[in-house]
Protein backbone atom coordinates (compact mmCIF):
# COMPACT_ATOMS: atom_id res chain seq x y z
CA UNK A 1 0.00 0.00 0.00
CA UNK A 2 1.47 3.32 -1.03
CA UNK A 3 1.30 6.46 1.09
CA UNK A 4 -1.47 8.92 0.38
CA UNK A 5 -0.56 11.51 -2.19
CA UNK A 6 -1.53 15.17 -2.24
CA UNK A 7 -4.67 14.50 -4.27
CA UNK A 8 -5.96 11.93 -1.78
CA UNK A 9 -5.20 14.20 1.18
CA UNK A 10 -7.05 17.06 -0.50
CA UNK A 11 -10.09 14.87 -1.07
CA UNK A 12 -10.09 13.74 2.56
CA UNK A 13 -9.76 17.35 3.74
CA UNK A 14 -12.70 18.41 1.56
CA UNK A 15 -14.85 15.57 2.85
CA UNK A 16 -14.05 16.51 6.45
CA UNK A 17 -14.91 20.15 5.79
CA UNK A 18 -18.20 19.18 4.17
CA UNK A 19 -19.13 16.78 6.97
CA UNK A 20 -18.22 18.96 9.93
CA UNK A 21 -18.35 22.47 8.52
CA UNK A 22 -15.56 24.97 8.80
CA UNK A 23 -16.84 26.37 12.11
CA UNK A 24 -16.59 23.05 13.94
CA UNK A 25 -13.18 21.97 12.62
CA UNK A 26 -11.15 23.52 15.47
CA UNK A 27 -13.39 21.81 18.03
CA UNK A 28 -13.11 18.49 16.23
CA UNK A 29 -9.32 18.78 16.02
CA UNK A 30 -9.12 19.68 19.71
CA UNK A 31 -11.28 16.69 20.65
CA UNK A 32 -9.20 14.34 18.54
CA UNK A 33 -6.03 15.66 20.18
CA UNK A 34 -7.43 15.13 23.67
CA UNK A 35 -8.59 11.65 22.78
CA UNK A 36 -5.17 10.74 21.43
CA UNK A 37 -3.45 12.01 24.59
CA UNK A 38 -5.82 9.99 26.78
CA UNK A 39 -5.36 6.92 24.62
CA UNK A 40 -1.56 7.20 24.76
CA UNK A 41 -1.56 7.64 28.53
CA UNK A 42 -3.81 4.60 28.97
CA UNK A 43 -1.53 2.50 26.77
CA UNK A 44 1.48 3.58 28.85
CA UNK A 45 -0.36 2.64 32.05
CA UNK A 46 -1.30 -0.76 30.63
CA UNK A 47 2.30 -1.43 29.64
CA UNK A 48 3.53 -0.30 33.05
CA UNK A 49 1.02 -2.54 34.83
CA UNK A 50 1.92 -5.46 32.60
CA UNK A 51 5.64 -5.02 33.30
CA UNK A 52 4.99 -4.80 37.05
CA UNK A 53 2.81 -7.90 36.86
CA UNK A 54 5.45 -9.87 34.99
CA UNK A 55 8.09 -8.73 37.51
CA UNK A 56 5.90 -9.98 40.35
CA UNK A 57 5.45 -13.31 38.59
CA UNK A 58 9.19 -13.71 38.09
CA UNK A 59 9.91 -12.96 41.76
CA UNK A 60 7.49 -15.64 42.96
Swiss-Prot record:
Keywords for this protein: Cell membrane, Membrane, Protein transport, Translocation, Transmembrane, Transmembrane helix, Transport
What is the role of this chain? Part of the twin-arginine translocation (Tat) system that transports large folded proteins containing a characteristic twin-arginine motif in their signal peptide across membranes. TatA could form the protein-conducting channel of the Tat system.
Membrane topology designation: Single-pass membrane protein
Q: Which InterPro entries match?
A: TatA/B/E, TatA/E
GO terms, biological process: protein transport by the Tat complex
GO CC annotation terms, alphabetical: TAT protein transport complex
Question: Which HAMAP family does the protein's record reference?
Answer: TatA_E
Instruction: Give the matching PANTHER family.
Output: SEC-INDEPENDENT PROTEIN TRANSLOCASE PROTEIN TATA
Q: Which domain of life is it from?
A: Bacteria
- What are the transmembrane regions? 1-21
Instruction: Provide the protein name.
Output: Sec-independent protein translocase protein TatA
Q: Which GO terms describe its molecular function?
A: protein transmembrane transporter activity
Name the family the entry cites.
Answer: Belongs to the TatA/E family.
Where, per UniProt, does this protein localize? Cell membrane
Q: How does it assemble?
A: The Tat system comprises two distinct complexes: a TatABC complex, containing multiple copies of TatA, TatB and TatC subunits, and a separate TatA complex, containing only TatA subunits. Substrates initially bind to the TatABC complex, which probably triggers association of the separate TatA complex to form the active translocon.
Q: What Gene3D superfamilies is this protein classified in?
A: 1.20.5.3310
